[in-house]
Amino acid sequence: TYTFCIALCICSFVSAQLSENACISLVTCTPGNEVYTRYGHSAIRVCDTTAQLDVVFNYGIFNFDTDFFYWKFVRGETWYELGITSTPWFEYEYKQYKRPVYEQELNLTPEQKQALWQALITNYQPENRKYLYNFVFDNCATRPYQLIKNALEDSIHSDYIGYKGQTYRTFLRHYTGAHRWINAGINL
């Protein structure tokens, strides 16, 4: 019911403009011990004190009760969705597991903030929320990145050329460590 109340509040802001006091941040959470937390987590926080709004848009929501969850996760066959949580609740959840949360406020113009806000609201519509999770190409880190990049109208430029000589599997092993069954699943 708590999530429903937040969603109801968000729906009332759908056509609203963010105030000039609004801040949008990229939230980064450190990796955890469970297989689905091994890579860390990212989300987007929208805080507008004028509108009494402080929420996190979280692309890491999934149904853990899905049959064969771990098997589907390592094979990239897990459906995830965008959820909205109050910032205090989001932070509380990570503190429970002793996983630090870092926040980087984005230096956006009012127009860019509004564009990102509208993109988040559009993504939260029922027909847009769900996506087939892929731990390399489509996940809780790539989704916020794409939204931020689009809001900035492709003014993000990177000199990143990748890890030369490393495959995705080799790179992912840095996060999975000695968990052989996770590595075996990734190798499939």
In which residue ranges do the predicted regions lie?
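A structural motif
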Residues: 108-121
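Sec-dependent signal peptide recognition
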Residues: 1-7
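Glycine-rich catalytic cores of cysteine/serine-nucleophile enzymes that process amide/ester linkages
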Residues: 20-98
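N-terminal signal peptide c-region/cleavage motif recognized by signal peptidases
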Residues: 11-13
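Extracellular structured ligand-interaction cores
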Residues: 23, 41, 54, 103-105, ...
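Activation targets extended, charge/polar-rich intrinsically disordered C-terminal tails
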Residues: 122-188
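Boundary of Sec targeting at the N-terminus
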Residues: 16-17
